[in-house]
Amino acid sequence: MNIEKNYAKEFEMIEKAYEQAGGDVSNLLSKDIVSLIISGDKVLGKNTVEGIHLNVETSEGVVNYEMIIEDGVKLDKPIHLCVGFLKNQGEQYINAKYKIGNNCDIKFLSHCSFPFGKIHHKMDSEMIIGENSIVFMEDEHFHNEKDGIYLETSYYTKVGKNSVFDSRFKLTKSRAGKLKIDMFVDLDEHSKALLESKVWGKKDDDLEIREIVNLNGEYSSGIAKSYIVAQDSTRAEVINEAYGNALILKVI
């Protein structure tokens, strides 16, 4: 990956933030690894490999990107996503779309870092997974120790026949701030999903997590679970629900 010269200094700062969130910067720069680096409303760099198409645009302060993965793509190395915001205050909006083909085996590692100030981060994500595919998504966050972070994210995933979707969200290395997460999954026949969230709330953090699994296809199965530590005067509201909409299903 080549970083734009105009963004070289900002990339140095985002490197530090990325490492705070648990990332390895070398993975962002390797040419044989799919990666995307977003800082505020700017795309600092991106890289892709054969079989994966990454389209990115910014418009009116919003970062929009679409990742299309062709049928049969199986990656030995994870796709790395780096999201950060380095200003003392402001808003960050991201719209993400993923289209994953049939017979794929894909792992995503996402690290998000907001080390400064009063930030509103809003993200809408849609993922469509084809048939007979395995998709793992690990999303780790690092926020600052003040109370200025408002994280508002909405995820929708459709899991095709015989496919597996495994999603892990983690925010345990810092305060959470105000957190609102909505995860919705639709499962087709013989598909499986695991949704797991781990969050550590401190002081007056405000946590809202909703994980909804719709078992639409026969013999589909799903797990939605959250691990929350609420210290001090933290408020936490967690909703995990599964709906059986097929004649034959399994809820674990």
For each feature predicted by the language model, list its residue ranges.
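Conserved beta-strand/loop scaffold segments within soluble protein domains that form the structured core
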Residues: 36-37, 44-252
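Short, Gly/Pro- and small/polar-rich lid/capping loops
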Residues: 1-55
